[in-house]
Structures are given as C-alpha cells and as structure tokens.
C-alpha cells in the first residue's frame, strides 16, 4: 500500500526531484519521439549495418552470377573446341595453334610501300629516300643502297648525284669540287634530296659541294678505321692498296667509288684544271673526323698523299686496260688470239691493192719500153740510111743545095729520136718515183 501511494503521489504532485523520475517513468513513450536518444541511435546503426550487409550480399550474388556465366561460356567454348565434330571445330577461332601468315610487300624508300591493297594506300605515309628523315649525317646502314658500275655497294643518293653531275657536264667545268656553290641553293637542294628529288636547274658546283658534304657529315669517316700511323707509313702504291684492303666492306666500297670519281675528274684536267693533287686536297678533309683542328689539318696532308697515290694508280690501271684493248703493231695478219682485226684487214687490203697497182704499172711500162726499143731500132736504121745517103750525096754532089738538104734530113731524124728517148726517160722517172 505504501508503494502504491508513493507512486500516485509522485504522479499527481510533481516536484523538482520527481521530474526526472517522471521522465524516467514515461521513458517508453518519449524514447520513440526523441531522435537523439541513445536507443534510437543504436537502432539506426543496426539498420544501416543490415542495409550494408544486404548490399554486399547482393554484390556477391551479382559477381558470382557473372563469374558463373563466364565460366559456363569458357567451358562451352573449350568443350566445343575439344568435341570431335569436324564442323564445330572448323568454326572455332581458337582451334589453329600453329599458323603463320606470310605477306610479301615491296618497300621503296622514295615512294613508300608498293604492292599493298588499294584501301591501305591512303594510310601509308610517304617516306624520305632513306629510313631516316635525311640523307645527310646518317649511317649507310639506314639508307637505300645500289650497285655502281664497278660492283661497289654505295648509297643510291650518291649515284643519283654522280649521274646528274656527269650529265650536266660537271667534269668539264673549271674548278669543279674546288669552287663552292651558293649557300641558299645548297639548302634548297638538301631539302629536295631528302625527298629523293634532284632539281633540274641545279648548279654543278652546288652538286659537287653536296657530294663532299655527304662524306663530311657521316657519323664516322671513311678512313677512321685506319690509324694515322698506318696512313703515314703507306707511301708506295702497293702499300696503299694493302691498306685499303684493311677497311670494312662498306668503307672500302665508298672509298673505291670516291677514288674513281676523282680519277674521272683528273682525266678532264685540261678543261677543269684539277689534277690528282688538287682533287685529293679538296677531298682529304672530308674522309676523316678529328676533334682537334690542328691534328686534323696535319693528318689531312697525309690523307691527301694517300688519296693522290690511289688516284694515280687508278689512272695507270685504266691506261693499261685501254692499251690491252688496242692491238699491238704486228707484221702477222693475226693477233695473239688468232683473230684478224678490222684495222689489220684493212691495212692488208690496202697493201694488196698497192702491190697490184704497181704490178700493172710495171707491166704497162715494160710494154712501153719494148715499143720504145723498137722505135729506137727503127730510128737507128733510119739514121744509118741517112748517113749513107749523106756520104753518097757529099761525094757525088758539087753544089750547096745538096749539103743544105742533107742537113735538114739529119736534123729531123735526130730530133725525132731525141723526143722518143726523152719520153722513155720520163716514164722511167715516174716509175721510180712511184716506187
């Protein structure tokens, strides 16, 4: 009873001390209304955790379903590839395991790819005449190579420049390879050469300068593989030839091409005023690369002598080869191969005609001499008759008329005989002169 009264009193008579108890007594109703109560906060956290768990379970389910679909697809493809049915296996892409697709195409550094389908052509960019962006200052390994007339493998751009230099009469121009071209035109021609084009209105001096520049701008000089001591010690032609054989194949081909180019220039020395020493002097600094300018200048003198010796030897070899082609003077109508040359045949034909003409002339002169002898005999007989008549007339006649008549007959007979003898002597002199 006491407890009930107390509870009723606390409910009907609020007091400051009982206010808290009232709030506590009515906690079940107030807890649902106050959002900041500890009970509501914990419940809200539980609900969020449940939602997170449900989302994770949903993601796991979706992932597992996707994996199951992927695994089933792979399983079907593998099973389909392993099935013994030929039709099914032929349709599968992954069945061939050892397949090679070989395509043969032609690559032209001047015009790009050749032989590709038409639909691929617009996508293929045009390339420079070498694998690099320029033909100057790059290695010969990255350039298009061709064979020259001597079988040397050299860059195609060098052969193009050489051909244009020869066709434009550059070898006959005075000071070729010594006189430099215009800088502005040289830069323009460089750009055109990088495109694989040589302009038509090019100056031969500019073209010759670009040939020297090509050698000068190589990553490594043509003679850099040889030591300066080896070059200095090579003085004779045989020593220089042996030294050239020590060069790598690429450098040896480039040097042989350059030496023959310089020899062609020297053969036109009367027109271009460039002898072996002059052309070797302008090419020597372009064949080596040294950091020290003074050392490079001193070494260039030795290289000049080396190049000069090779040029002179090349000219000698050319002269010997030309002499072998021309048949030597031989009295025999046949040469060392047993064949008759056209000039030899013509010479013998002219000689035979001359001998035949002389024989005919001798026969004719012999006939005329015989006729002249007969005439002389007749003249002699007539002279004897005249003498006889003269003596008879002198002895028998006593007047001057008879003497006058005898003198006229004698003069006429003697003049006729002398004219015949003179004509015979003239024929003999003519025959002797013809001999």
Swiss-Prot record:
All residue ranges annotated as the Rho-GAP domain in the record: 138-319
Sequence segments annotated as region (Disordered): 1-59, 321-343
Translocase among keywords: no
Positions marked as site (Arginine finger): 178
Pfam families given in the database record: PBD, RhoGAP
Null allele phenotype: No visible phenotype under normal growth conditions, but mutant plants have increased sensitivity to stresses induced by oxygen deprivation.
Coiled coil: none
Low complexity: bias regions: 7-23
MF GO annotations: GTPase activator activity
Keywords of the record: GTPase activation, Stress response
Protein induction: By oxygen deprivation.
SUPFAM superfamilies: GTPase activation domain, GAP (SSF48350)
Gene Ontology biological process terms, A to Z: plant-type cell wall organization; response to anoxia; signal transduction
Location of the CRIB domain: 93-106
CDD domains with a match to the protein in the record: CRIB (cd00132), RhoGAP (cd00159)
Keyword Aminoacyl-tRNA synthetase appears in the UniProt entry: no
Functional description taken from the UniProt entry: Acts as a GTPase activator for the Rac-type GTPase by converting it to an inactive GDP-bound state. Acts as a negative feedback regulator in tolerance to oxygen deprivation which requires ARAC4/ROP2.
Protein name, as recorded: Rho GTPase-activating protein 4
């Amino acid at each position: 009873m006491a407890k009930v009264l107390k509870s009723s009193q606390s409910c009907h008579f609020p007091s400051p001390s009982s206010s808290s108890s009232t709030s506590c007594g009515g906690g079940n109703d107030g807890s649902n209304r106050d959002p900041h109560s500890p009970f509501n906060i914990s419940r809200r956290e539980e609900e969020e955790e449940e939602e997170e768990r449900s989302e994770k379970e949903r993601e796991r389910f979706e992932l597992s379903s996707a994996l199951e679909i992927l695994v089933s697809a792979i399983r079907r493809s593998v099973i389909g590839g392993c099935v013994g049915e030929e039709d099914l296996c032929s349709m599968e892409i992954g069945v061939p395991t050892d397949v090679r697709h070989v395509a043969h195409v032609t690559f032209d550094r001047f015009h790009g790819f050749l032989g590709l389908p038409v639909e691929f052509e617009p996508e293929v960019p045009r390339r420079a005449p070498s694998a690099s962006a320029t033909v100057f200052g790059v290695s010969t390994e990255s350039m298009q190579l061709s064979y020259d007339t001597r079988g040397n493998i050299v860059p195609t751009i060098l052969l193009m420049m050489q051909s244009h230099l020869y066709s434009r009469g550059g070898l006959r121009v005075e000071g070729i390879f010594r006189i430099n071209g215009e800088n502005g035109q040289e830069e323009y021609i460089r750009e055109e050469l990088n495109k694989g084009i040589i302009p038509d209105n090019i100056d031969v001096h500019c073209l010759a300068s670009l040939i020297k520049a090509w050698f000068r701008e190589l990553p490594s000089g043509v003679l850099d593989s040889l030591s300066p001591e080896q070059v200095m010690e090579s003085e004779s032609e045989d020593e220089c030839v042996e030294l050239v054989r020590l060069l790598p194949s690429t450098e040896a081909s480039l040097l042989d091409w350059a030496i023959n180019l310089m020899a062609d220039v020297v053969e036109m020395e009367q027109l271009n005023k460039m002898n072996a020493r002059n052309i070797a002097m302008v090419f020597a600094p372009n064949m080596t690369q040294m950091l020290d300018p003074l050392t490079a200048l001193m070494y260039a003198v030795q290289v000049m002598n080396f190049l000069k010796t090779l040029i002179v030897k090349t000219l000698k070899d050319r002269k010997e080869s030309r002499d072998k082609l021309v048949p030597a003077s031989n009295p025999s109508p046949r040469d060392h191969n047993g064949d008759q040359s056209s000039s030899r045949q013509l010479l013998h034909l002219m000689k035979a005609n001359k001998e035949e003409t002389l024989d005919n002339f001798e026969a004719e002169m012999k006939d005329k001499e015989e006729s002249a002898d007969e005439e002389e005999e007749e003249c002699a007989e007539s002279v004897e008759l005249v003498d006889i008549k003269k003596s008879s007339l002198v002895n028998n006649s006593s007047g001057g008329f008879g003497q006058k008549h005898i003198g006229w007959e004698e003069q006429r007979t003697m003049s006729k005989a002398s004219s015949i003898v003179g004509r015979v002597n003239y024929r003999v002199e003519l025959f002797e002169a013809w001999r």
